[in-house]
Amino acid sequence: RQVGYMTQKFSFYEDLSIEENLDFVARLYQLPDRKQVVAESIRGLGLEERRKQLAGQLSGGWKQRMALAACLIHQPKLLLLDEPTAGVDPKARRDFWEQIHGLAAKGLTFLITTHYMDEAERCDRLAYISYGNMLVDGTVAEVIAHAKLITWSVKGPRLGDLARQLRELPGVEQAVAFGGVLHVSGSNEQALENSVSAFRRDPWEWTRVSSGLEDVFIHLMQTAQDNFSR
């Protein structure tokens, strides 16, 4: 009872209401004062107006909120969340994370898997696992520092063509589009400088920037070894 687990795929009964689903979970845990516990769970996650609504009629964001209420109903000390906001809209994601931060402030510990780097940045500590191996762990600042990446941000026309050229050069470990700019990175500063110096001219504008968590994530993905290819 010390651990709660929330699956990525919604795993509750869609032909039951929110209230009925939570009551079912409370029965499984044999919780005393079941009705009061369910009412508090509904109130705590802001589900009062929808408590009679069938789970199958809920949007992705409301389903995740109901699932969180169910996972918290037995008051665990550790909650495992597997891709908790996959497939939900940006507002629902933000609201969900506000709930997470509020619960964490009360002392609840979360272990979360995510592919969203903006969500990873919300966590106190990170661990990057690839093919069953932990490549790096630490705070956001520690993970970024560990990669030792040098990153340039490039603005200008034909960035796709520029990226293809740069990827062929020594020292350029990645050239990846970020919205309307190109991030060019490498861990060997001199080799990177030698390769990109010829391109630091019109029509492109080059700016040295701090490497972000997403730059590091892409770098780690590229260097990770697929254990099925050994």
Where are these regions (language model features)?
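Hydrophobic anchor residue at the start of the ABC signature
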Residues: 68
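Conserved ABC ATPase "signature" region
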Residues: 23, 27-50
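ABC transporter nucleotide-binding domain
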Residues: 98-187
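Conserved ABC ATPase signature
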Residues: 54-58
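Catalytic Walker B motif of ABC-type/P-loop ATPase nucleotide-binding domains
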Residues: 79-82
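Conserved catalytic motifs of ABC-family nucleotide-binding domains
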Residues: 75
